[in-house]
Amino acid sequence: MRAIVHALKYEGRRSLAVPLAMLMRERGADLLDGAHAAVPVPLHPSRRRARGFNQAADLAKHLGLPISPALRRVRATEAQAGLPAARRHGNVRGAFVATRAAAQFRGRTILLVDDVSTTGATLEACARALKEEGIREVRALTAARVPTGGGPG
């Protein structure tokens, strides 16, 4: 799984988003059920330009939910993959804000989508921004989960 996610994210093999999303749909069916939209974890604009795409958005497109740009990354951060667990929460604190698009989901359930979760720091920061906007329930679905202490990812 690690090699597939790496190829999608760092080698630009975007076609891998389709089979990964299919696996996510199977394993996360309970999370998809009742969700009103999928919200990909946004990249900072500078990182998006450098990579050329957002892998979380590519995954979200194939989950069968409407996609919402309900989050914006307002601060560039260090890559989480290069940081020890103890620094990850501080690295992304305040990095995300809800957009106007989030308002239509007040009192509803949305699904955050990302490629990898290690400590959950990024997902927690995103969920916090959405909850502050009045989103009732924020669920999260990732293609891969790296056990804490399992190395970068």
Where are these regions (language model features)?
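Conserved PRPP/pyrophosphate-binding segment of the phosphoribosyltransferase/PRPP-pathway fold
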Residues: M1-L112, T119-G153
